[in-house]
Amino acid sequence: LKPGILVIDIGGSGIKAAVVDEQGNLLSERLRVLTPHPCLPSVLIDTVVELVAPCPAYNRISIGFPGAIRNGLILTAANLDSREWIGFDLPDALSRRLGNHPARIINDADLQGFALIQGKGLEMVITLGTGFGSALFRDGQLMPHLELAHHPVSDNLTYDQYLGNAALKKIDVSEWNERLLRVLDVLEVLLHADHIVLTGGNVRLVTVDLPPSVSIAPSDSGISGGAALWRHRT
């Protein structure tokens, strides 16, 4: 078998990994471990190295990270509880621990989005988990990343605070669902997207009827998007 691409999807609650081929098909089982907290870079790297030890051969690494990325460096990491992430070169650090294979990094919602979009029109992928992640695509091409997570949406609450895990500690699931519908209304006015995909660990909580243009994808279905980092300039 030709060596695959190791995909590491880092979230505020969990870290997932698998090896995929160039089309994104799984070559290994999906592995998962809880994200350590507080999550310093050295702690996360040790956790990832241990997690991926059973993986079959790979010669490239794709990383999805819960924050804003520019030129391979991390700009924000609000859900990982450490300022050591700011400016950190995670691809280089992981590459040195994992056989010096070339590594690329992208926002985690962007990574998952490549696996979930249809490739036609204006599409948005929203991850509902520890925080609120978003990715925007036009005709299959990734648009400049919009970090909506930290933008005010209602009563001076950011999207993270309004729909993330912090909100679920204060409101019941019914109210959370109503908030989700209000956010979808806001995004409809803002973007008029042809298709919106909801994914992430908290999509299991969605009970309301969604607009026809909105669909749900299982939280583990996006990892194959890591193959796209080696097909597209990101």
Give the label of every model feature segment.
Residues K2-V43, Q141-K170:
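Short glycine-rich, Thr/Ser-proximal phosphate-binding strand/loop in the N-terminal lobe
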Residues I5-D9, R60-S62, E123-T127, V197:
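Short glycine-aspartate micro-motif
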Residues G14, L187-S219:
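Glycine-rich phosphate-binding loops at beta-strand->alpha-helix junctions
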Residues I15-V19, G67, F114, F132-R138, ...:
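Short beta-strand scaffold segments in enzyme catalytic cores
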Residues E29-A53, A57-S62, A68-L122, Q161-Y162, ...:
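Glycine-rich phosphate-binding loop and adjoining helix at the ATP-binding site
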Residues L90-Q112, Q141-R179:
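Glycine-rich phosphate-binding loop plus the immediately following alpha-helix
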Residues G121-M124, T130-V153:
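Anionic-ligand binding region
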Residues W176-L190:
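A short, acidic, amphipathic alpha-helical segment used as a generic capping/interface helix at domain edges
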